[in-house]
Amino acid sequence: MAQVKRIRRNVSGIILLDKPLGFTSNAALQKVRWLLNAEKAGHTGSLDPLATGVLPLCFGEATKFSQYLLDSDKGYETLAQLGKTTTTADAEGEVLQERPVTVGQADIEAVLPKFRGQISQIPPMYSALKRDGQPLYKLARAGEVVEREPRSVTIARLELLAFEGDTARLAVDCSKGTYIRTLVEDIGEQLGCGAYVAELRRTQAGPFTLAQTVTLEELEAVHAEGGNEAVDRFLMPSDSGLQDWPLLQFSEASAFYWLNGQPVRAPDAPKFGMVRVQDHNGRFIGIGEVSEDGRIAPRRLIRSE
């Protein structure tokens, strides 16, 4: 007997998941996608299985804007285990070296300023970056080590929240592409004792914070009671991650031409940059970019939500 193909729903929006410990970002995405029975889904950048916290999941039309969330600044809290280094720079790796921890809180406070502002990082081998089409973590598992180019990242905030014996809890606000494992490892080397990430929790992704998230258990409970459609109540609008962008509202005529790919003028447009656009009814219809001639060129358009 032929298997009946499941008909997925055309739903759009963003669910802010508090990613559970032990899940890959994709596994978490596929679980929530199943709960929604959503046709199209994508996440906004991977969190390691060891990490928990803010993971924006995009569905339907919202997937068109996931790159802009991927490029946004992030916030983390991490627990650094001092005195050891591991193969992966976190608790999942094998211990490479152990050294005595002779530093105190004042020593840690003294080195942190060196890692604030614009710094250079060498990405870890255990990362999703690719070399000749192969993820670095696969090469690392095969015992290979390849040269990685340093990358410039910005640490806007680096604060010691607590220090106890051989652990330090840190708060980090950083630019996209920052590896917290590398940051902790580099701090450990500066202290002379080594360190790895024992815990990692993302507290912010772009405009989104932990206070806005929902747990997988909460989603499952709602689904058990009301099915796929009951989970829809957790969907945020597709432009939720773009709330700090300038907002323009087009007339009915301008919206018509713009949705058909034509740049249009808007009296309140900024002189440059990206903008969110609503139609005359206040419905989000996409994002545009201000051209040199002042017109708004369409960049990503959405269907009616």
UniProtKB/Swiss-Prot annotation:
It catalyses: uridine(55) in tRNA = pseudouridine(55) in tRNA. It is an enzyme of class 5 (isomerase). InterPro entries: PsdUridine_synth_cat_dom_sf, PsdUridine_synth_N, PUA-like_sf, PUA_sf, tRNA_psdUridine_synth_TruB, tRNA_sdUridine_synth_fam1_C, TruB_C. It holds the Pfam family TruB_C_2. Its EC number is 5.4.99.25. One of its GO terms (molecular function) is RNA binding. The active site is at 48 (nucleophile). Keywords: Isomerase, tRNA processing. GO terms for biological process: mRNA pseudouridine synthesis; tRNA pseudouridine synthesis. It comes from the Bacteria. Gene3D superfamilies: Pseudouridine synthase, PUA domain. The keyword Isomerase applies. The keyword Ubl conjugation does not apply. PANTHER family: PSEUDOURIDYLATE SYNTHASE TRUB1 (PTHR13767:SF2), TRNA-PSEUDOURIDINE SYNTHASE (PTHR13767). Responsible for synthesis of pseudouridine from uracil-55 in the psi GC loop of transfer RNAs. Belongs to the pseudouridine synthase TruB family. Type 1 subfamily. This is tRNA pseudouridine synthase B. It comes from Pseudomonas fluorescens (strain Pf0-1).
